[in-house]
Each structure stands twice: as structure tokens, then as C-alpha cells.
Amino acid sequence: QFWVSFCDDAGSIENEAAARGLIAKAFSVIESFMYDNHLKLNPGKTQFIPFSRKKVTSSYAPLVLNNQVTIFPSCEVRNLGVIMDSNLSFVSHVNQLRRSCFYQLRRLRSIRVFVPSSQLETLIHAFITSRLDFCCSIYHPLPKNLVPRVQTIQNACAKFVTGAKKFDSATAARFKLHWLPVAARSKFRILTYAYRIVHTKEAIPKYLSEPYSTVKHGRVTRNNLSNSLHCSYKFRLVTVGCRSVYCSILYLWNSLPSDLRYIPTYTAFKRSLKTYLFRQAYELF
């Protein structure tokens, strides 16, 4: 499955027509590539989704490709396991994640009496935590009402491992297991990207590393001493642009203490970062 998208900030008819032409051109290139490699593109499984703000109510016309195939707009598409809607609210993705995780948790509860207590955490990591950590960087810019819904999954898992009762504190169970909350795990993932952008750009994709540069001035300033980042992209819309991973990397990295930014090795940085986020999440400062 090939997923092609475009970003139209201006919203004018001319820009939309140009973007449609680019998508049709990209589709023909992909189709030619597959034909040369003895593959056939299935138009019935090809999806087209326009992304827009909630206030934009204009309907989008179907996309007509070069081979006269008509693709109608979809409200939701699945891309690499993540369900994306036209407003990028990720409500459907969170609902699907909760259903799959709680289904796995119910299955594990049925065999808990046969599993040693020392192996319960391993089972949780294999069947549920791996789902929570997959593409977890999208949880950081989620609306505030959705993050607690994801957090309830981890809370139930923590009580399952520790044997806590229904009305016991989930925070105490997570603290006992030394688990970072969902929001902190998302920050951890994004900050590991930021560290590789600053220190080892060859280990990060170019589309993530190219917009960034370290702040340098002609004289000694606090920014020079703090190893802060600067992004060439301009974020015009707070509710949309500032939810992007580019803005999240910039904000979270520049908010870190300067001693964490200068840690020389990636392994030591991850260890120190987890300790910092753990103390911050459970207010241990």
C-alpha cells in the first residue's frame, strides 16, 4: 500500500488543483515502478484523504488519476498501523488502541494463575507495552482529553502486574514498577530524536534533521552555552502547526537542562533522560 499526501496551507482552489496534479503525477510514477517490477497497483485499495481544520467545511471532489481511476476522499486511513483522520485528532486510533490492549489484557488475566509473578511484566511488555510504544510520539501533541484514555491502559497493566486491587492507586503501582507515564514515554521518544539530530545527524532521517541547526552567535551568550536548537520552519497555527513533531522536538529539547544536552554518549543520555523524566513525572525533585 502506497500512501500519498499533500499539505495545503493556503487553502485556495489554485493550490488545491496544483496539489492534485502532483498527487496524480506521483501515482503514475509509483504505478510505472510497480509495472517494471512485475507488480500491479490495486486502485480499489488506494485511499485519498484531505487534511483540514475542523472549521473548514468545504467538501473535496474525488481524485481522478491519469488512468481514469476515480478515488473518493476517505475520512480515515491506516498508515503504518496508525489510524489518521482528516482533522488529525487521532480519536479513532486511541479507541482502536484501547480495544486491542484491553482485549489482550483480558486474555492475560485468564491465564494469570498459571504464570509466575516474575513473568507477568514480561507478558505485559510483549502484548501491550509494545502496542503503546509503537508510534508513541503522536501522544505528545494529543488533546488533553485523549491522553488520560491512553493512560488508563498502562494503569490497568500496572495493577495487573503488581496485584493491586481495583480502587488502589495506579500511580503507586507504576512507581513500584519504575514505569514512565504515557506522556513521559512520548517525551522520551521525541527527545531521543532530538539528541541524534544535535549529536549524530547521520543516525536520523534527513527530513527530521535538515530543518534544525544549533543556535550560534558571534559572542558568548546563554544559548551558546546551552546547546539549544533552532528550526527553519515557521509554525503559523498554534493548534495545528505546533502539534507537529518539528515543534515538539524544538520545544522539548530547549526545555531540557543544559547538563543533559551535553551528555557525550547516546546510551548515557537515555539513562539520564529516563531518570529526569521519572523524577519529573512523580514530583521527586
PLM segments and residue spans:
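Hydrophobic/basic alpha-helical segments
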Residues: 1-285
